[in-house]
Amino acid sequence: MGRIQYIFILGLVLLVTQVRAQDPNGSHAITPEEQQAMAAYLKNYHQYTLRATPVVPPGPVRTMAEWEPIQALILSWTGQPTIQREIVRAAVKECKVIILTSNADNVSGILTNAGIPLDSVTFLNEPFNTIWVRDYGPWTVYKNDIDSLWIVDWIYNRPRPQDDQVPGIIANYLNLPIYEATQAPYDWVHTGGNHLPDGLGTLFSSNLVLDENPGKSEAQIDS
């Protein structure tokens, strides 16, 4: 990974995407209860998540830029059907759409009644904690710039184990290798909303990534 530039970013982000009961529209910010639970969650992390063997990619990779073309868009379908319906309407014209839902028939009906074709839509009956898939979903990297497509993941910065399993679920569905920064010395607590790569070796992030990885220096995170 190229050098990470630590900056403060303020902007609008399109959100498509227990140690608590499922609350699909739950808080984006970490709650006081979750703050208290985070240390124990990290200590027992691999008990909470269903993962492949946590290893880093076998060689240099290029992280996909924020604005590069995508093969698929992922949504966690919750109690925001009007907004999510219109996201799907726009997305199916450009790419495949993968929807995580506990009720595929209901979602299918909503989309069909709105005149949205389902040819490019896949429903996965998988659990999740919240709507914020931008933060916990998979990220893609390429070997040799545009060669092999792989999925990468890290430890989500919320104690929400069902959310944290989504990258592995997507990797299994797409039959793609998944590599994870979840085991020392490469373990890394992070969130997709604080992860803005340019595709050329620079990753933009706020100082939050330093706060959430107190055992690592800026140089270690850069590397």
Language-model regions: role of each:
Residues 22-223:
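The feature marks the mature, well-folded catalytic cores of soluble enzymes
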Residues 1-6:
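Positively charged n-region of N-terminal signal peptides that target proteins for export
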Residues 17-21:
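Sec/Tat signal peptide C-region and signal peptidase I cleavage site
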Residues 7-15:
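Bacterial N-terminal signal peptides
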